[in-house]
């Protein structure tokens, strides 16, 4: 990943709508040939490490409106965020990093985090 334009995403929030935006921004930038970096903090880090990308959580995050959206998404049956991320990572120009302090603050197991990201910084 040298001599290419770079695209950096700093992700803090772990709500589905924010995770969706992170993934769509990453796939767009990577598809355009940019070196793409995602830096994970706090709830985004927790959801990523625990692979909690399910849109069904919308109902608990956004009440009745989230329930309606989750039902609609179930009907549409979109490709999962996890699958999209795997595809983007396969392109070779996406790196995902975890914040050292956030790993400790969120009480995440360091070995598990290391197995899900490119590095802990």
Predicted segments — roles?
Residues 42-46, 102-103:
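Short beta-alpha junction loops
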Residues 80-121:
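A charged, amphipathic interaction segment
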Residues 56-90:
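A glycine-rich helix N-cap at a beta->alpha junction
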């Amino acid at each position: 990943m040298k001599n290419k334009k770079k695209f950096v995403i700093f992700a803090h929030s772990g709500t589905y709508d924010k995770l969706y935006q992170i993934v769509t921004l990453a796939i767009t930038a990577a598809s355009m040939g940019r070196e793409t970096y995602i830096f994970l903090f706090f709830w985004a880090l927790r959801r990523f490490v625990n692979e909690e990308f399910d849109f069904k959580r919308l109902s608990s995050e956004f009440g009745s409106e989230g329930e309606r959206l989750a039902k609609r998404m179930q009907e549409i049956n979109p490709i999962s965020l996890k699958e999209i991320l795997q595809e983007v990572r396969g392109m070779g120009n996406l790196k995902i990093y975890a914040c050292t302090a956030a790993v400790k603050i969120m009480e995440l197991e360091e070995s598990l985090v290391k197995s899900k990201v490119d590095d802990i910084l």
